[in-house]
UniProtKB/Swiss-Prot annotation:
Gene3D superfamilies: F1F0 ATP synthase subunit C. This is ATP synthase subunit c. GO terms for cellular component: plasma membrane; proton-transporting ATP synthase complex; proton-transporting two-sector ATPase complex, proton-transporting domain. The chain crosses the membrane at residues 5-25, 47-67. It is found in: Cell membrane. One of its GO terms (molecular function) is proton-transporting ATP synthase activity, rotational mechanism. It is a multi-pass membrane protein. It comes from Alkalihalophilus pseudofirmus (strain ATCC BAA-2126 / JCM 17055 / OF4) (Bacillus pseudofirmus). The keyword Transmembrane helix applies. Keywords: ATP synthesis, Cell membrane, CF(0), Hydrogen ion transport, Ion transport, Lipid-binding, Membrane, Transmembrane, Transmembrane helix, Transport. It comes from the Bacteria. Belongs to the ATPase C chain family. CDD domains: ATP-synt_Fo_c_ATPE.
Length: 69
């Protein structure tokens, strides 16, 4: 049962991370399209936001590995 729980946690974490990154990149592209002069600022915020969005799934995967061992 622990294997199933770890697999579900890791899978959901991966999907959630991918969706979060897609939303951040989509918002950056839309913002750049609306105001091209803010491209540098939006890109900087994206480069900060993507690792923050990826941190939670990485922590969830580590916790799912801890469930196994």
């Amino acid at each position: 049962m622990a294997f199933l729980g770890a697999a579900i946690a890791a899978g959901l974490a991966a999907v959630a991370g991918a969706i979060a990154v897609a939303i951040i990149v989509k918002a950056t592209i839309e913002g750049t399209t609306r105001q091209p002069e803010l491209r540098g600022t939006l890109q900087t915020l994206m480069f900060i936001g993507v690792p923050l969005a990826e941190a939670v799934p990485i922590i969830a995967i580590v916790i799912s590995l801890l469930i196994l061992f």
